[in-house]
Structures are given as structure tokens and as C-alpha cells.
């Protein structure tokens, strides 16, 4: 079937030749019908010989010229095509040389842009790490504040700054996340408690508590740093859009897969917003005057979840709250997926 495709392409590209040769032969036959002195038997012999030689010529040309395009169809690198001299005609060699120059130039641009991105990533990372030092010092100064009301307000703002810095750091590292992952069995409960501790100043100000219920074995095979980032972003959203209601957190077992749910009783997400919640920079169409949200939290979650093999489910009702469920993969599923990614990279 594939050969028939190439034959069809070849005949279509040579259709002008074929029509011209047929026209010349028909013209000779037409002349023989008008000129009775012209030997008809000799003419038929000439036409038959001409068509036969044309057929042989087309077959030989087909095998010679289609060879290059079959290599293109196999997605071979242009360097291999050029250095192995798969191009046989002058026009083919000119085409391959042009493609080689263009692709080489684009590759150089990609390498240059990648170096610039790496430098940008390094600059942002160093900036965040550097600014963490005065932020940590600020926390020590806040802890010395005697006025509890003022101290709580300062800790609330400090927690927001610290959270935004961490978010920026994760955004910067998104491109290199695959190189930055190490999978192991870790405790979901431990990760959740650690993240709750980081948000306690915000939850206290907003009058929000946490109902934690881990019913099943909570150990999952994942990368602890990126998994904590996902939990942090979901908790941050739950706190941001809730007030004076507890947030429920727990684990369940479904088809041997451990799932973690985080349920809040906040404003909820409208049906028209639901398809867009993972878009970069999207906040909400319901509260356009709100400036505290960056729209990066769920974008980060969505960008990382596939690398961790996590299946994400979000259900929400306006005015009643939102439930986010993280379904974790088994170890063999992660190993199999990583093997597929490795094979594709080669």
C-alpha cells in the first residue's frame, strides 16, 4: 500500500511528461490517417517502441528519484541524508543542501535560546534564594513582636510573600522538572501536615481549621518536593476562597490506588469557568476586581501532575465549595511510564 502511494505521487508529478509523450504519439497516428503514403505498420511499431521505452524510463526514474523521499518519510535526520548522499539528482542535492542549511541555522537559534532560558532560570533562582534570606530574617523579627494582633497580621502577610516566592521558584523550574525528580515511597500524611504548618498563619487569620482523616495506608510512590508543591497550591486555593469553614483532608483507596481529597466550603467554581481553571493566568470571571490571585496555582499543578503520574479530579458547586482529588499511581505504573519517556527521547 505504501509503494502504491509513492507510485501515485510519482505519476502525478510526471503527468505533464506523460501527456506530452501521449500527445506526440497520437499526433503521429493522426498524421498517418491523413497521409495514406505513410506506412501504418511501421508507425505502429515506432509508437509501440516509443511507449515501451518511455515506460522503462519512467520505472528507472521512479526508483532513482523516489528513494530520497522515502528517507524523508522515515523521518531520518537531514545530516544523515546529506552525508550518505541519498540525493542523486542535482535538484535533489540542491534541496537537501537548502534544508541542511535551514535546519542547522534553526538548531543554532534553539541552542542559543535554550542558553538564554537557562541563564534566565538561574538568575530567577538565585534571586529567589537571595531574597529568602531577608524574608527569613523578617520572620525572626516578627516573632519578637509583643502585640499579638499586629504579630498575627504581619505573619499573615509574611506567609503570603513566602508562598509567592516558592511559587515563582517552581514556575522557573518547570522546564527542568523531569531532571529534578526523584521517586520514592513517602507519607501523604506527613506531607499534608507539613504544608498545613506552612499555611497556619493564613488559616488562623481567616478562621479556617483542618479536619484530617487518613483512613488507609498513606504511603505513595512519588517525588516529595513536587508532590508537596501540588498539595500546597491546592491548599492555597482552598484557603484563598474560603472563610470561617474547616477544610477536610483525607485519603481513600480506589482500585488499589491511594487518593487524597481536599474539600473546602468556599465560593466554588462556576460551570463556565471549570474548563479554564488550568489555564495560565486564569483567575475567575465571577470576581474581576480581585487582585490577590495570580492564576498560576492550578496551572503549576496541571503542568506537573502528568510527570508524577497523578490523576486529578475537580468537582465544584457555586456557593458550596470545591473538592480536589489526587489519585496516585502504583510504582510499576511510574516505572513503565518513565521507560516509555526514555525510549521516546532516544
Swiss-Prot record:
**Which Pfam families does the annotation name?**
HATPase_c
E.C. number(s) listed in UniProt:
2.7.13.3
Q: Which GO terms describe its molecular function?
A: ATP binding; phosphoprotein phosphatase activity; phosphorelay sensor kinase activity
Q: Which domain of life is it from?
A: Bacteria
Query: Which keywords does this Swiss-Prot/TrEMBL entry list?
Result: Antibiotic resistance, ATP-binding, Cell membrane, Kinase, Membrane, Nucleotide-binding, Transferase, Transmembrane, Transmembrane helix, Two-component regulatory system, Virulence
Transmembrane ranges?
15-35, 43-63
Q: What does it catalyze? A: ATP + protein L-histidine = ADP + protein N-phospho-L-histidine
- Quote a single Gene Ontology cellular component term: plasma membrane
Question: What does the UniProt entry say about where the protein is found?
Answer: Cell membrane
Instruction: Identify its membrane topology class.
Output: Multi-pass membrane protein
Q: Which residues form the Histidine kinase domain?
A: 126-332
Name a biological process GO annotation.
response to antibiotic
Q: What is its main location?
A: membrane
Q: What does this protein do?
A: Member of the two-component regulatory system GraR/GraS involved in resistance against cationic antimicrobial peptides (CAMPs). Functions as a sensor protein kinase which phosphorylates GraR through the auxiliary protein GraX. In turn, GraR up-regulates many genes such as adhesins, exoproteins, transporters, toxins, and proteins involved in cell wall synthesis. Down-regulates the expression of many genes involved in RNA and amino acid synthesis or glycolysis.
**Quaternary structure annotation from Swiss-Prot or TrEMBL:** Interacts with GraX.
**Name of the protein in question:** Sensor protein kinase GraS
UniProt gene name: graS
Amino acid at each position: 500500500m505504501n509503494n502504491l502511494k509513492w507510485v501515485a505521487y510519482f505519476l502525478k508529478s510526471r503527468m505533464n511528461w506523460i501527456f506530452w509523450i501521449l500527445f506526440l504519439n497520437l499526433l503521429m497516428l493522426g498524421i498517418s490517417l491523413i497521409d495514406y503514403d505513410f506506412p501504418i505498420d511501421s508507425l505502429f511499431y515506432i509508437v509501440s517502441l516509443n511507449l515501451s521505452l518511455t515506460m522503462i524510463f519512467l520505472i528507472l526514474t521512479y526508483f532513482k528519484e523516489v528513494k530520497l523521499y522515502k528517507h524523508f518519510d522515515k523521518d531520518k535526520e537531514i545530516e544523515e541524508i546529506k552525508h550518505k548522499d541519498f540525493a542523486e539528482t542535482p535538484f535533489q542535492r540542491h534541496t537537501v543542501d537548502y534544508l541542511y542549511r535551514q535546519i542547522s541555522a534553526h538548531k543554532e537559534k534553539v541552542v542559543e535560546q535554550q542558553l538564554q532560558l537557562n541563564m534566565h532560570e538561574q538568575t530567577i533562582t538565585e534571586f529567589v534564594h537571595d531574597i529568602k534570606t531577608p524574608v527569613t530574617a523578617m520572620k525572626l523579627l516578627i516573632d519578637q513582636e509583643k502585640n499579638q494582633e499586629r504579630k498575627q497580621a504581619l505573619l499573615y502577610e509574611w506567609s503570603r510573600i513566602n508562598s509567592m516566592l516558592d511559587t515563582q521558584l517552581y514556575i522557573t523550574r518547570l522546564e527542568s522538572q523531569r531532571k529534578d525528580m526523584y521517586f520514592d515511597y513517602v507519607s501523604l500524611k506527613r506531607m499534608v501536615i507539613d504544608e498545613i504548618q506552612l499555611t497556619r498563619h493564613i488559616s488562623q487569620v481567616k478562621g479556617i481549621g483542618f479536619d484530617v482523616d487518613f483512613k488507609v495506608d498513606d504511603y505513595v510512590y512519588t517525588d516529595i518536593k513536587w508532590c508537596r508543591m501540588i498539595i500546597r497550591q491546592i491548599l492555597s486555593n482552598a484557603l484563598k476562597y474560603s472563610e470561617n469553614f474547616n477544610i477536610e483532608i483525607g485519603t481513600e483507596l480506589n482500585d488499589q490506588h491511594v487518593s487524597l481529597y481536599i474539600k473546602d466550603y468556599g465560593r466554588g467554581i462556576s460551570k463556565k469557568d471549570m474548563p479554564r481553571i488550568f489555564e495560565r493566568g486564569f483567575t475567575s470571571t465571577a470576581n474581576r476586581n480581585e487582585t490577590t490571585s495570580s492564576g498560576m496555582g492550578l496551572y503549576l499543578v496541571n503542568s506537573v501532575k502528568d510527570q508524577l503520574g497523578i490523576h486529578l479530579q475537580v468537582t465544584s458547586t457555586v456557593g458550596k465549595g470545591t473538592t480536589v482529588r489526587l489519585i496516585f499511581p502504583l510504582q510499576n505504573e511510574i516505572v513503565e511510564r518513565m521507560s516509555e519517556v526514555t525510549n521516546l527521547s532516544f
